[in-house]
Swiss-Prot record:
Originating gene: MT-CO2
Segments on the Mitochondrial matrix face: 46-59
Cofactor(s) required, per the database record: Cu cation
EC top class, as a word: translocase
Any GO BP: cellular respiration
Catalytic reactions of this protein: 4 Fe(II)-[cytochrome c] + O2 + 8 H(+)(in) = 4 Fe(III)-[cytochrome c] + 2 H2O + 4 H(+)(out)
Residue sites binding Mg(2+) per the record: 198
Binding site for Cu cation A2: 196, 198, 200, 204
Topology of this chain in the membrane: Multi-pass membrane protein
Keyword annotations of the record: Copper, Disease variant, Electron transport, Magnesium, Membrane, Metal-binding, Mitochondrion, Mitochondrion inner membrane, Primary mitochondrial disease, Respiratory chain, Translocase, Transmembrane, Transmembrane helix, Transport
Phylogenetic placement of the source organism: Eukaryota, Metazoa, Chordata, Craniata, Vertebrata
Positions bound to Cu cation A1: 161, 196, 200, 207
UniProt-recorded name of the protein: Cytochrome c oxidase subunit 2
GO molecular function: copper ion binding; cytochrome-c oxidase activity
Length: 227
């Protein structure tokens, strides 16, 4: 999860998030290089007093500043497209969970376990126990296994919402009348937090998401739901 004064992205808990962090560093390196070249050109312009008013054109320079940006865009676009297609892949999921957004809570349905349905509300401050996180903990967590592909089916019953868990690299819009899907495979156990990432009304900030990821062997013994 995020920490106060944190610089950078959250630690990755899925292969997709690992790819996103790598792409972030790749793009940031290119941006730093561009900024350095621009600042260097400005420095030379401000410090040199040599001028030449006889230059009418510069074909070589025009060729360079046309081709170079195109190469930079390709270097950014290709890895981005690769990750984009990876996020859309659905490869025989082991478990399917349906998430429905409401103002201002989430409903989850375990379609593979007899249609188990429950609501997940944010815990009010009066109900928080030592160790609970304000505005992030919920009354009913979503319990899922690690090391297994999981498909999330996401929709909304009223307005636009967005189901997002940063440490897993997930952010999928919940749209009324439309069923979106995303898949992920968690790589380590723990409790991971997310929030609604689409402004959805007065209590938009009070729609947390909590995933409790447990080892696959324990989950196969019988899903442990904190209801």
């Amino acid at each position: 999860m995020a920490h106060a004064a944190q610089v950078g992205l959250q630690d990755a808990t899925s292969p997709i998030m690992e790819e996103l962090i790598t792409f972030h560093d790749h793009a940031l390196m290119i941006i730093f290089l561009i900024c350095f070249l621009v600042l260097y050109a400005l420095f030379l312009t401000l410090t040199t007093k040599l001028t030449n008013t006889n230059i009418s054109d510069a074909q070589e320079m025009e060729t360079v500043w046309t081709i170079l940006p195109a190469i930079i865009l390709v270097l950014i676009a290709l890895p981005s497209l690769r990750i984009l297609y990876m996020t859309d892949e659905v490869n025989d999921p082991s478990l399917t969970i349906k998430s429905i957004g409401h103002q201002w809570y989430w409903t989850y349905e375990y379609t593979d376990y007899g249609g188990l349905i429950f609501n997940s509300y944010m815990l009010p401050p009066l109900f928080l126990e030592p160790g609970d996180l304000r505005l992030l903990d919920v009354d009913n967590r979503v319990v899922l296994p690690i090391e297994a592909p999981i498909r999330m089916m996401i929709t909304s019953q009223d307005v636009l919402h967005s189901w997002a868990v940063p440490t897993l690299g997930l952010k999928t819009d919940a749209i009324p009348g439309r069923l979106n899907q995303t898949t992920f495979t968690a790589t380590r156990p723990g409790v991971y937090y997310g929030q609604c990432s689409e402004i959805c009304g007065a209590n938009h900030s009070f729609m947390p998401i909590v995933l409790e990821l447990i080892p696959l062997k324990i989950f196969e013994m019988g899903p442990v739901f904190t209801l």
